[in-house]
Amino acid sequence: MGNAKRATQNDEDYTFVSPVVKYLLFFFNMIFWIISLVLISIGVYSRIVKHETALACLTVDPALILMVVGILMFFITFCGCVGSLRENICLLQTFCIFLTIMFLLQLLAGVLGFVFSDKARGKVTDMFDNAIKHYRDDLDLQNLIDYGQKQFNCCGGISFMDWSKNMYFNCSDDNPSRERCSVPFSCCLHAKEETIINTMCGHGMQALNYLAASAFINTNGCIDILVNWIHSNLFLLGGIALGLTIPQLVGILLSQVLINQIQDQIKLQNYNQQHRSDPWS
């Protein structure tokens, strides 16, 4: 009789749910939950500090992107955290489904970007042209463009003449700006030993032909150089893309394993409950 009771007690204490899987999934989601709060905070801060039209030149406000990504990540990781901790199948399935959808959307975006590379290039060119037009409107945008032009040794989207699309650098005769026919200093060729940057080095460069201007500034556009850089660093970009997808695949795998374990545990509990009520069944 005593052995039968101990056997029944052991069956009730036994669990299919692995603590390793359960708490690994919990801490995995906790890390990304904290990251989501950081993204939301940065996005909200940027929206409050910046003027409404500060980054209107871009297709989508980066602060808004951060907020949307942060809120979406917060919801998904919340489902993962609570679902794993409380062993809630509904929340875990929600977590798994959203992660799967995100993974498939990223895969689809990569395929579409490769198939429609010409349209993607045209979209990037339009964005760069818009950024040029608003170069003086926002300091952060200005610093971003200057950093890109210095980093890639380029000037403008297609060529340095693109800077004529900016009202201050426009080369038309009726432009009263002191920067007429100029380009930003980030287009200039700087010697490595040069410690003081001449911010007026791009003055009047649009009035020169390509050959004459190339002695003072980078005349090649940033779009072609960016495309060449992407082609030269495909393995690096592929590694980054893989690094972004691995956590998602790990999350999907762990959540699915935990769901199966919880379902097995529920079956065991139902069996034990039925066995207690009818030991002869």
UniProtKB/Swiss-Prot annotation:
Residues 1-23, 84-94, 255-281 are cytoplasmic. Disulfide bonds join 154-222, 155-187, 171-181, 188-201. Its main location: membrane. The chain crosses the membrane at residues 24-44, 63-83, 95-115, 234-254. One of its GO terms (biological process) is protein maturation. Belongs to the tetraspanin (TM4SF) family. Homodimer; disulfide-linked. Part of TspanC8 subgroup, composed of 6 members that interact with the transmembrane metalloprotease ADAM10. This interaction is required for ADAM10 exit from the endoplasmic reticulum and for enzymatic maturation and trafficking to the cell surface as well as substrate specificity. Different TspanC8/ADAM10 complexes have distinct substrates. This is Tetraspanin-33. The lineage of its organism: Eukaryota, Metazoa, Chordata, Craniata, Vertebrata.
